[in-house]
Amino acid sequence: MTIPFQSSTAPTLGVEMELQIIDPATGNLTPRGPELVTFCEEHPEVGLVVKPELVQATIEINTGICKDVAQVERDLTTQLTLLRSVCRERGVSFLSAGTHPFARWRERRYTQTPRYRALVDKHVWTARRMQIYGLHVHVGMPDGDTAIQVINQITQYAPMLLALSANSPFWEGDDTGLDSCRTKVFENLSSAGLPFRFENWEGYENLINVLLETGSIGSQREIWWDIRPHSDFGTIEVRICDATRTLAEVLALTALVQCLAVYFRRLYENGEEIRLLHPGIIRENKWRACRWGLEGELIDPLTLKGVPTRKLIEQTVGEMQSLAAELGCSAYLAAIPAILASGNGATRQRRIYSQSRSLVAVVADLEAGLAT
C-alpha cells in the first residue's frame, strides 16, 4: 500500500503541549480532563480546543499551522490564557512537566474510547503507567523522501533536545536519579524509542505495511518514535522532549528544532555528503541525556569524542545563528543560553525540593511556570 505524503513546501510549524490537570488544594493529579474536553466541544465560541489523552488527568493543546515561531507564540499564548479561565471556573489548574512529582499511576483513570481501550488491552501494565507528558514539534516537509532524510539526520541531535528539555526527575515521590524519567517510562511501549533509519520513503512504507498487515499496529498513529514522519500533515514530528515548565522554553526548543530541520533539509536538497552516526552512538547519547541532562557529556556527532553537553549545544546553537535570522526565530533561539546557565527543568525541580523538602512546593513552582 502506498502511503501518500501531504507536501508542505514551507518549513511550517505546529506545536502540541501535553498538560497535567491538578487539584490546586493538594497539587495532585485530578481526572477532570474529560470535563474540560466536553466543555470546549459544547462551547466552540470560547475558542479553546482541548484534546483528550489516555490518562484523564491529561489534556493536549496545540497550535494551528504556523509560518514561524512568533505565530506559535501567539497561538499558544491565546490557548493558555483561555485554558486558565476555563480551569479557574472549575476549580482546577494545570502545569507542564514530563512527570508529576508524586502522583501514583495506580490511582489514574483512563479515557474509555475504543482507541485507548485497545492501547491498554495490548500494552497492559506498560500503558497504565503512562502518566507522562511531552512536547511535540512539527516541521513541514516537501515530500516523504526529504522527511526521511531529515529524520535520519536530526535524530543524531535529538539527545541535545532531550538534555535541554529534561523535566521529569521524580516518580511517585522518589528522585529517580534520571533527569528524564519520562523517557524510560515511554520507551516500554512496543513502538516507542529512537526511529529506525531508512534510505527513502519507500523503505518506511514497507515497514509500516508489514506492521499493519500483521496486526502489529492499527495505524501510523501507533508509531511512537522519538521523531516520526506525519504523512497526513506533511511534517516530521519531533517528540523526544519532556514537557517544559514555561512557554519560553517551548519556544526556544521549537526554534532549535525548526533550524535543525531546515539545515538538514537543505543539505539533502543540495546533494551534500551527510555523515550518519552508528545507531549505538545515538542510543548512548540518548541515555546520557536522559540520565545526566546538561550535566554530563555527549559524543560529538562530528568528532566522535566526548564533549560536555552544554558546550556541544552551544556550538550547535552558534552554527544555527544565520539560519535563525533568516527564519525569524533568533530571539527565541537566544533563550537557550539561559537554560544552559540555569539548568534544565530537572535541575530546577531538585533545587526547589532541596530548599523546601516538599514535593508539593515543587508542584507549586511548576504550576507557576504557566500561570501568566
Curated annotation (Swiss-Prot):
Family annotation (SUPFAM superfamilies): Glutamine synthetase/guanido kinase
Catalyzed reactions: L-cysteine + L-glutamate + ATP = gamma-L-glutamyl-L-cysteine + ADP + phosphate + H(+)
InterPro entries: GCL_type2/YbdK_subfam, GCS2, Gln_synth/guanido_kin_cat_dom, YbdK
NCBIfam families: gshA_cyan_rel (TIGR02050)
Entry-linked Pfam families: GCS2
Record has Ligase as a keyword: yes
Organism: Gloeobacter violaceus (strain ATCC 29082 / PCC 7421)
Protein name per Swiss-Prot or TrEMBL: Putative glutamate--cysteine ligase 2
Assigned EC number: 6.3.2.2
This protein's record includes keyword ATP-binding: yes
Molecular function GO labels: ATP binding; glutamate-cysteine ligase activity; ligase activity, forming carbon-nitrogen bonds
Keyword entries, A-Z: ATP-binding, Ligase, Nucleotide-binding
Role noted for this protein: ATP-dependent carboxylate-amine ligase which exhibits weak glutamate--cysteine ligase activity.
Enzyme's top EC category: ligase
Family: Belongs to the glutamate--cysteine ligase type 2 family. YbdK subfamily.
